[in-house]
Each structure stands twice: as C-alpha cells, then as structure tokens.
Amino acid sequence: MEKIKDQFANLHILRRSSEPKEPTYLLGIDTSKTVPAEKGGLVAVLCSNGSIRIYDKETLNLLREFSGSPGLLNGVRFANSCDNVYSASTDGTVKCWDARLASEKPAQLFKGYPSNIFISFDVNCKDHIICAGAEKVEDDALLVFWDARFTSQDLSTRDPLGAYSETHSDDITQVRFHPSNPNMVVSGSTDGLVNVFDLSVDNEEDALVATCNSVSSVSCIGWCGRDYKQIYCMTHDEGFCWWDLNHLDTDEPITCLNIQDVRDVTDVKEGHLDYLIGGLYHENMDRLFVIGGTNLGKIHLLSCTKTGLSHVTSLQGGHAATVRSFCWTVSEDSLLTGGEDAQLLLWKPGAVEKTFTKKDSLKIASSVQQRVRVHSSDSYKKRKQQ
C-alpha cells in the first residue's frame, strides 16, 4: 500500500492542454492501445459540446476534433487493435472515426433502431462486438449489439445484430465489456440494476448471469479482482457497491461492500470528499482503488476493502473545478485528468510543468450545463421515486 501511495503522491503536472477556442467540460478520456504506453500515442477526450478531441499524449497538442452533430456524444473508447475511436450518440448511432485522419466523416456508422437515443456503449476486447445502452422509450430500455469487424466488403453503415429488452426498466447509463473475455458484458441503469451477461448464450434470459441491485441510479461500473471476476458500481448520489461473481454458485454472499453515500463514511485527511469519479483495479497489487474529488479540483485516491473505503493520498494544484474524468496508466505511473475547468492535465512522477495555462474557474453557458449529467442529480432520484 505504501508503494501505491508514494506513486500517486509523487505525481506532478508535466503538461496542460492549450486553451481551446470553445471551453467545455471534459467528460471522458481514453488512450490509444496500439503503441507501448512509454512511446506516447493518442488521447481521445469527450467534450460537453458534443465533440471528441484528439491530442498527442506526450505534448497534449490538439491534433483534430470530431463532431457528433446532429446528436450529442456519450462515452469515448479507442479500439484495442487500431486507432479507431468510438462514441455513442443521441441521434441513435454509434460513430467510429480513424483518429489518425482529419476527416470529419465517421469511418463507420452503427445505426440503431428507430427512436433509439444512445447514452452509453463499449467495444469488446477483440473489437468484434459493440454494445450500446439506450434511454427508455415507452416500455423499452434496450441494449443494442453490432458486429464491429471490418471485412473486405466493408459497409460504412451497419445495422444491429439484435437487442436485449427485458432486463432493464429505465435508461441504461453504463456498459462495460470484460477486459479479457469478449463474451462477458455488464450494464447499469437508472433502475439501480447492474446486469452481467454471457453473450455466447443465445437468448437474453439465459444469457443473464447475474443481477445486482445498487438501489440507486448507476453512474459508473467496472470489472476488478483476480481474472476480473468481480464488479463494482458507483451511483449518481455517490453510493458505492462491490460484488464477487465467484460466489454466484456458492452459499457465500456476492456483496463485498455496499455504501449508500461514501461522503458520509469516508474520512479524508485534512479535507473532504464531494463526489466519486471512477475506479481502478491494480492487477499487480490485486487491489481496487476509487478516485474521488472536491468541487475545487482536489483529487483523492481511496483504497477499497471489504471494510470500506479508506483515504490513501491526494493530488492538488491542478484543477480549479470538479474533475470529471481520468485515465491512469499504471505501467508508467502516468495520469491524465479532465474537468469542468476545461483543463486536460498530464501527471507524471516528479515532473516539472513544461507549459502553463491559467487555470481560472470556467463559466459555461447554462444551455450546455443543462445537457451534462452531473453527479448529484436530483432528476435521477425523482425519476426513480415515481
């Protein structure tokens, strides 16, 4: 534990992205996987103005920007085998761009069913399947699937393979494929349910491996544990759950931890916790960590055990507003963070900042702010109580 504490505490800002022409919240970050982490690569950032910005990972220079118009984009993910970058759109599509090219037009377009509004998605570890979660329309909240493989007779537009419609009763806010098993996927919804599916099974009912209940609207899910046989979940009202799927066929309870509001029970040294950002499973340590923060931009590292969340250490001096996204490359102790101050920061051990951008608090027009799903969303609570 001391090692990870020192690694995190020793992170310092190496670079900030240049001030964009249109300041936006930075809602999601992913890095390209086709080159070794230490040799640089690309960074894709989801912005609240409905675009994805592509940066050089080492310099944080903005290379190009892709627009999701006419829809708003939700989520950002690089392919595992190439530099294609994906995002789900409220216009009922999942869009795929070649991040190396400046073309505004998507390389591929995965079309949903009529009336689909996609708010979450993921691509499996082999880049074969895309799954997107939709907002509830009438009585249906769909998980939609596509074949994402390129062929010699490739079509730029793809229709769905099919959909699951029986396992969620409200908006599907999160989708995450297993890191190494291409057939396993977990989904989370505003109905509070977190469902695990095995896509190698033919029908939806039999494919459902487990249903876990967070009792609140799901904001983040992920895989963890040895062989990634555990899942964790965060909620829009700052709850945290952790389940062990190894115990599905035993008498042992699958719930490892269930905290209704982490802000009430987590003691942060010389500070406080306002919200959760996401989770990180450290394979070498076999330990799950949770990243949280404050409304003034301080970042907290929390360790997760079956007794609760405990504060390890914190980073400060980088952001001036709520931090909304991060991407931590454990192999090189490299951290990327993005926030509501429109800043993209690269942190590395013992770094000395090579560029400087004034980090004033960002004031964003209310029309944009209303489109962005923030953490403590009363609308989710009201919808759930209805």
Curated annotation (Swiss-Prot):
Entries under InterPro entries matching the protein: WD40/YVTN_repeat-like_dom_sf (IPR015943), WD40_repeat_dom_sf (IPR036322), WD40_rpt (IPR001680), WDR89 (IPR039328)
Pfam families, alphabetized: WD40
Record keywords: Repeat, WD repeat
GO biological process, one term: corpus callosum development
PROSITE patterns on file: WD_REPEATS_2, WD_REPEATS_REGION
WD repeat copies, ranges: 21-65, 68-107, 112-156, 167-207, 213-253, 318-357
Protein's UniProt name: WD repeat-containing protein 89
Organism name: Rattus norvegicus
